[in-house]
């Protein structure tokens, strides 16, 4: 993802949707809530990356240790993690996943089309096609 975003810094907008796979990972919902809460303090990606590193142990205690490590305001983090707004955002993201038949992560779309070849070359071809189709003809 970083490589394709770097190749098209002015042409792409990356949108991340939460999709906690709670049927597979018992702590997935808390991890999603933590990423959303950290994002409200400008550290969403950092939280995501740190949680990915400890994905085998995503207990609430471990998640909070990561929040402390990232220097988050813990009162705000706890409030945001448990807020109805965070729950709604995640439920809305899950609704989008259901509506688009997404059932696993990661899943990528470029201009509404499912990316089947997630290599840099595959994504680049789809981005180039979308950009060519978006340009007005002369």
Write out the residue ranges for each language-model feature:
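Structural alpha/beta surface segment adjacent to cysteine/selenocysteine redox centers
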Residues: 1-68, 128-135
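C-terminal cap of thioredoxin/glutaredoxin-like
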Residues: 1-5, 64-138
């Amino acid at each position: 993802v970083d490589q394709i975003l770097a190749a098209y810094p002015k042409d792409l907008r990356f949108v991340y949707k939460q999709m906690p796979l709670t049927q597979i990972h018992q702590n997935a919902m808390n991890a999603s809530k933590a990423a959303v809460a950290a994002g409200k303090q400008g550290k969403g990606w950092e939280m995501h990356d740190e949680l990915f590193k400890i994905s085998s142990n995503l207990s609430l205690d471990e998640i909070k240790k990561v929040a402390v490590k990232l220097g988050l305001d813990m009162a705000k983090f706890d409030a945001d993690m448990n807020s109805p707004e965070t729950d709604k955002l995640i439920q809305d993201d899950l609704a989008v996943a259901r509506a688009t038949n997404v059932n696993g992560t990661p899943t990528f779309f470029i201009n509404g089309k499912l990316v089947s070849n997630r290599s840099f070359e595959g994504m680049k071809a789809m981005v180039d096609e979308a950009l060519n189709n978006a340009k007005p003809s002369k």
